[in-house]
A protein has these predicted regions:
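Short aromatic/hydrophobic "clamp" motif used to bind/position activated sugar donors
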Residues: 86
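Hydrophobic, well-ordered beta-alpha structural blocks that scaffold small-molecule cofactor pockets
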Residues: 260-407
Length: 407
């Protein structure tokens, strides 16, 4: 399949500080049949971006255009590309060396050269100089994504620079909407991935920088555009798609509400809340909640970790009618405080409570916590991944919506 050419398109605006890393990562691909197009979207940095691109000479194809936004730069790249496949590398992101090779190999193995390929990716937090773990979908989401690429979009698992897209999909669905300043990517992913089977590679092939100069942080219209985008998405998803991917419209809207609450998109949150209130609960919800409760046993539940993860998991349990006894945290300054109506204790104090106990491990980095539990001879515990898998057994109860009211 080396005869299939990949066009790596790098749009850039005032990005000389990171551009060299992006171009180098594109040129260093282990897959030989690639071209690199750098689209300068009217940078106003006294020629710094142009000088950086000029260093590469004929190794890249360089285009300059008047400033029109990322969508217009990407569309120029799509018009000018000679390849069979489109790959987008933001000027502040980087491909791992074997990204293109592994994605082409996956296409060869599946036998469908027009299948869209996605992958995991890693986040590089510039201010903290921290390279995070790979962003991975949960088990239930992976099952959905194997059925329909729409699930990946609705779960915000499409980075954009992780994608390898055959050019036929632009002919089928069109290109980026140039009237959108910050949501042009997800607008297109929704159109392109809906109804499509995808390949999802469970390894990170892209490093994505998170920094203060990004458009999503600096363009004033971002929140308004996102509210409009997500309201439009949920209004367009059909009942048939909701049943296929989520089990019911009720479960679909609860998943969308969980996402909305993690964002500043208040209009979207209110819209989805209204959808839930207008629906009846699934007829089998009570029995599913009972089965869920059995997974946590009959003992007292303690949430290990009084941070963001612990609070969120506790909220998800409360939404399903499950109460914890309290929180456990190693930070002495947190101990003996009250969090969400529950006392924070040390592990030693929590284990002195009478009766059976099950510890719910909330931190993402769980190895140290599990080691601590085992050293204390605690064998009844559940990991964050196990808790999340159990929570997927049943959506929240509508009567618990009041728990989500913001102060």
């Amino acid at each position: 399949m080396n005869d299939k050419k990949i066009s790596i398109i790098i749009p850039v605006y005032n990005g000389a500080n990171y551009l060299r890393n992006a171009i180098d990562s594109a040129l260093e691909q282990t897959y030989d049949n690639c071209e690199v197009l750098v689209i300068n979207d009217g940078s106003s940095d006294d020629g710094a971006t142009e000088r950086t691109a000029a260093e590469y000479g004929e190794r890249i194809r360089y285009f300059y255009k008047e400033n029109g936004g990322v969508a217009s730069a990407l569309n120029l790249g799509i018009r000018e590309m000679d390849g069979d496949y489109f790959a987008w590398c933001s000027h502040d992101d980087m491909f791992l060396p074997d990204k293109c090779e592994k994605q082409i190999q996956a296409l060869e193995e599946c036998g469908d050269d027009q299948r869209i390929v996605l992958s995991e990716y890693r986040l590089l937090f510039v201010e903290e100089n921290l390279l995070d773990e790979a962003v991975k979908p949960r088990k239930k989401l992976k099952r959905r994504m194997r059925q329909d690429g729409l699930a990946a979009v609705l779960a915000q698992m499409v980075h954009g620079c992780d994608a390898l897209i055959h050019k036929c999909h632009f002919e089928r669905c069109g290109v980026f909407d140039e009237t959108l300043r910050t949501t042009q990517d997800y607008d297109l992913w929704f159109r392109i991935l809906r109804g499509q089977k995808i390949l999802y590679l469970e390894e990170p092939l892209v490093i994505s920088r998170i920094h203060a100069e990004q458009g999503s942080r600096t363009i004033p219209s971002h929140i308004r555009e996102c509210n409009e985008l997500w309201i439009r998405f949920v209004n367009q998803v059909t009942d048939r798609e909701m049943y296929k991917l989520y089990g019911s419209p009720y479960e679909f809207y609860w998943e969308m509400l969980d996402f909305a609450r993690k964002t500043p998109y208040r209009a979207f949150e209110e819209h989805v809340t209204g959808k839930i209130l207008a629906l009846e609960e699934p007829a089998d919800l009570e029995s599913r909640i009972l089965e869920l409760k059995k997974k946590f046993g009959t003992g007292k539940l303690f949430m290990f970790g009084a941070g963001r993860n612990g609070r969120n998991l506790n909220l998800q349990l409360m939404l399903r009618g499950i109460s914890i006894e309290g929180f456990i945290d190693n930070a002495e300054e947190k101990q003996n405080q009250i969090l969400d109506g529950k006392k924070i204790e040390s592990l030693e104090c929590a284990m002195k409570h009478p009766g059976k106990k099950c510890i719910l491990v909330s931190p993402d980095a769980q190895e140290a916590v599990i080691r601590q539990l085992e050293e204390a001879h605690v064998t009844d515990y559940l990991t964050k991944a196990e808790i999340e898998e159990y929570l997927d057994m049943a959506p929240p109860l509508k009567e618990k919506l009041a728990l989500l009211e913001r102060g």
